[in-house]
């Protein structure tokens, strides 16, 4: 199972939010590229990057910051937030991003989703952000009436192989992920990367036992609740 450190970018800095609330931001690092290098040195094989400004404004904002992250690391970089057109999508792959994450576009722009799948295949990931089992979009500021599993079934038919599932009510709380919702998502039959609330190695072990492909960790790393290097070593010893 992949353990994926998260870097959320707001105003060019590495921040964490709680439950997607922009007013709750905590700045952890001024230079996200240095943060990415540190996670790579700790043993991360992939890094999760979100342009929070982009998610809120509807277009990529932190392009230069993302470029610096990609140029600073040799591991896979996945990027989401504000990818709403072909130009942004093509640009990210052109600078060396390994995977892109479509969120709002998966609901509102089927053509873009189809374009990404046809041109980039399994490098296209869909992020499903759920609040009370309904999908939220636009940087979590807008809640739809679409059920999370319903969207998962639809995008599976289009050819999406991997979904990042985030329970917004858990994100940044350090209270553990929504295991019940993740069980339902796994029934769809695509690879699931869990995000939101992961706060311990025990959480990671349970996710692996469930069959989750990866786990994105944010606040637990930045607050020191999980030591990435130590966690990766322990999981490796246990064959996870």
Swiss-Prot record:
One of its GO terms (biological process) is L-histidine biosynthetic process. Its EC number is 5.3.1.16. InterPro entries: Aldolase_TIM, His_biosynth, HisA_bact_arch, Isoase_HisA-like, Isoase_HisA-like_bact, RibuloseP-bd_barrel. Keywords: Amino-acid biosynthesis, Cytoplasm, Histidine biosynthesis, Isomerase. It catalyses: 1-(5-phospho-beta-D-ribosyl)-5-[(5-phospho-beta-D-ribosylamino)methylideneamino]imidazole-4-carboxamide = 5-[(5-phospho-1-deoxy-D-ribulos-1-ylimino)methylamino]-1-(5-phospho-beta-D-ribosyl)imidazole-4-carboxamide. The active site is at residues 8, 129. Disulfide bonds: none annotated. Pathway: Amino-acid biosynthesis; L-histidine biosynthesis; L-histidine from 5-phospho-alpha-D-ribose 1-diphosphate: step 4/9. It is found in: Cytoplasm. Pfam families: His_biosynth (PF00977). One of its GO terms (molecular function) is 1-(5-phosphoribosyl)-5-[(5-phosphoribosylamino)methylideneamino]imidazole-4-carboxamide isomerase activity. CDD domains: HisA. One of its GO terms (cellular component) is cytoplasm. Belongs to the HisA/HisF family. PANTHER family: 1-(5-PHOSPHORIBOSYL)-5-[(5-PHOSPHORIBOSYLAMINO)METHYLIDENEAMINO] IMIDAZOLE-4-CARBOXAMIDE ISOMERASE (PTHR43090:SF2). This is 1-(5-phosphoribosyl)-5-[(5-phosphoribosylamino)methylideneamino] imidazole-4-carboxamide isomerase.
